A protein has these predicted regions:
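Conserved helicase C-terminal RecA-like lobe
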Residues: 304-453
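Short, polar/flexible loop-turn hinges at active-site or ligand-entry regions and domain interfaces
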Residues: 13-21, 36-50, 59, 144, ...
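Conserved interdomain hinge at the start of the Helicase C-terminal
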Residues: 243-258
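P-loop NTPase Walker
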Residues: 1-40, 221, 406, 444
Length: 465
C-alpha cells in the first residue's frame, strides 16, 4: 500500500504515468515479477492450515500479506513458522537462532517437523513463499537495467534483502539510501541495522524536523542517546514549543477535543486501552475501521428517521432488517435477502406504514435500541454513550494502534503507553536497544502534545521513558 501511494504521489507531482516507473515497488513485488510468479504460486492460509493439521500445530494466518511475517497470526503454528522465517531473513542457522531466542515454549523436535513438512509441501505442490522470491532473485544474480537506485526505509531491510540490494547496486550510477537507524524497529523481521549503517560512506543527516516540537524533542533526544552503536546525528525540532504531559490514570487524559492517537507496544495492550475507551463511550478507529460498525450506525439513523415520518429506500430498509430478529422486527420470510426485496427498485421510498403492509415490518414504534435486537446489549450501551458525546462516528478523532503500525504516521496528540509484554520486557532487560528504538519512534509521532501515561502493568513490566 505504501509503495502504491508513493508511486501515485510521484506520478502526480512530476507529471508521469505509472508505466514509466515499472520498478517503483517493494523488494518482494520486484522479486515476484522478476521471477514470473503467479498469485496461485504463493503459499496460502489454507495451505498453512493443511500443514498445521499434519504436524499438529494450529495456524491463525491471514489470507493476505506483503511478507511471510505479515501472513502469520498468533497461534502456536504461527509462532513456530515465524522463527523459521526469521532465520532465513537473518541468514543464520535455525539451531543458532533457536538458541539465541531461548523461547522454551518452542520444542526443537516439533520445529524441525514443521520445517520439514513446510518445505516438503512447497516442493510437492509447487508453492513458494515471499522469502523464496527474494532467495530466487539472489540466486539468479541478474541485475536490472536501471540508472538510479533509491531505497526508502533502508534501516528495516533484513540481511537477505541486503543481498538482493547488492545485486540491484551492480548497474546504477546514482544510489541513494534513506532511513534512520534510530527508527530500526523491525528486528523481529530480521532488520540488519549494521548493513544500513555501512551501506555507503557518504552520509547526509537531515537536520530539521518538520513535525516534532521542542518539548517532545527533549524526550526523544534523551531516548535516542541511550541507543548503543547508533550513528551520531544532530537534528532540530520545529519552532513550535509543544508540550509534554504526564498522566497517572487513563481517565485523566483530556480527549474531549482534537485529534488523538494512542500508541502501545503490542496488540494485546492496544486492546486493553481500546476497552477503556469503549467503557467511557469514546469512538475510535483501529486497523482503519471505526469502533462502531458503519452499517449498524446507518441502521440506527435510518430507524430514527423512519420514526420521525421520513420514508426510506430499499437498501436502508434491508440494512435495518439485518439488525432485527425474524418474527420480532419483521415477519418470517421477509428477511433482507428474501424474494420480497429482489425485484424492488432501489430508488423507491417506503414509509413505515407501507413497509408494514408490503415488506413484512412488524416491529412496533420504539427507539432503535428497543427494536434492533441483533445489536448486543453491551454494544447498545456503548453506542448510546458515544452518541451522547456527539463525536463523528464514521470519522473518529481518536486512533489506537501499535507503535509499529504507526511508523511513518503523525498526530497532534500522541498518547504513549509504556507497558511491555512479558516477552518484550524479558528482552528489554537483556538488550534494551530494541525498546529504545521502538519508543523513540512512538514519541516522535507528535506534532503538538506528547501524553505519557503511567504504567498500567502491576508487575513492573514497562519501558522507562
Amino acid at each position: 500500500k505504501a509503495a502504491s501511494e508513493s508511486r501515485e504521489r510521484v506520478c502526480k507531482d512530476w507529471g508521469l504515468t505509472e508505466d514509466m516507473l515499472p520498478y517503483f515497488q517493494t523488494l518482494h513485488s520486484m522479486a515476484y515479477h522478476a521471477g514470473g510468479f503467479k498469485s496461485s504460486d504463493i503459499i496460502s492460509k489454507d495451505d498453512l492450515d493443511e500443514i498445521g493439521d499434519k504436524v499438529g500445530l494450529p495456524f491463525s494466518a491471514k489470507s493476505k500479506g506483503d511478507t511471510d511475517f505479515d501472513m502469520l497470526g498468533i497461534s502456536q503454528g504461527d509462532v513456530y513458522l515465524n522463527l523459521y522465517h526469521l532465520a532465513r531473513s537473518k541468514k543464520i542457522d535455525l539451531e543458532e537462532l533457536y538458541s539465541q531466542e531461548a523461547n522454551y515454549d518452542i520444542q526443537w523436535s516439533l520445529l524441525l517437523r514443521l520445517v520439514d513438512a513446510y518445505e516438503n509441501f512447497k516442493r510437492v505442490r509447487g508453492k513458494i513463499d515471499f522469502t523464496d522470491m527474494i532467495e530466487e532473485f539472489v540466486r539468479r544474480d541478474s541485475p536490472l537495467d536501471i540508472d538510479a537506485l533509491f531505497v526508502d526505509e533502508a534501516q528495516d531491510l533484513s540481511t537477505l534483502q541486503w543481498e538482493m540490494i547488492s545485486i540491484l547496486r551492480q548497474t546504477p550510477r546514482i544510489q541513494i539510501f534513506t532511513g534512520d537507524d534510530d527508527q530500526a524497529i523491525m528486528g523481529f523481521q530480521g532488520a540488519d541495522v549494521k548493513a544500513f549503517q555501512n551501506c555507503t560512506p557518504n552520509k547526509e543527516v537531515l537536520t530539521q524536523s518538520f513535525r516534532v516540537p521542542q518539548k517532545p524533542y527533549e524526550i526523544a533526544n534523551d531516548i535516542s542517546n541511550r541507543i548503543r552503536g547508533r550513528a551520531p546525528k544532530i537534528w532540530h525540532p520545529t519552532e513550535h514549543q509543544g508540550s509534554v504531559r504526564w498522566h497517572n490514570h487513563f481517565e485523566e487524559i483530556p480527549l474531549e477535543t482534537g485529534e488523538w492517537c494512542l500508541l502501545a507496544r503490542t496488540n494485546r495492550i492496544v486492546s486493553q486501552c481500546a476497552n477503556k475507551l469503549r467503557d467511557e463511550g469514546w469512538v475510535y478507529s483501529r486497523f482503519g475501521h471505526p469502533s462502531i460498525p458503519p452499517k449498524a450506525y446507518d441502521a440506527i439513523n435510518s430507524w430514527e428517521a423512519w420514526m420521525k415520518g421520513h420514508s426510506l429506500d430499499v437498501q436502508s430498509i434491508k440494512n435495518i432488517y439485518a439488525y432485527m430478529d425474524a418474527n420480532v422486527g419483521y415477519r418470517k420470510g421477509y428477511g433482507p435477502r428474501s424474494k420480497t426485496f429482489l425485484n424492488r427498485e432501489e430508488d423507491i421510498l417506503f414509509s413505515m406504514d407501507q413497509a408494514r403492509s408490503e415488506l413484512g415490518l412488524c416491529a412496533m414504534e420504539g427507539r432503535w435500541h428497543e427494536v434492533l435486537g441483533k445489536i448486543d446489549k453491551d454494544t447498545k450501551h456503548y453506542i448510546l454513550n458515544a452518541l451522547r458525546r456527539g463525536d463523528n462516528v464514521k470519522k473518529p478523532r481518536i486512533t489506537v494502534s501499535t507503535i509499529h503500525s504507526m511508523k511513518g504516521g503523525e498526530c497532534d496528540n500522541i498518547i504513549v503507553i509504556p507497558d511491555l509484554s512479558p516477552a518484550a520486557y524479558k528482552a528489554y532487560r537483556k538488550n534494551p536497544e530494541t525498546e529504545h528504538r521502538v519508543f523513540y519512534v512512538a514519541v516522535t509521532r507528535t506534532k503538538g502534545t506528547l501524553h505519557l501515561l503511567s504504567p498500567m502493568d502491576t508487575k513492573g513490566r514497562y519501558y522507562e521513558i
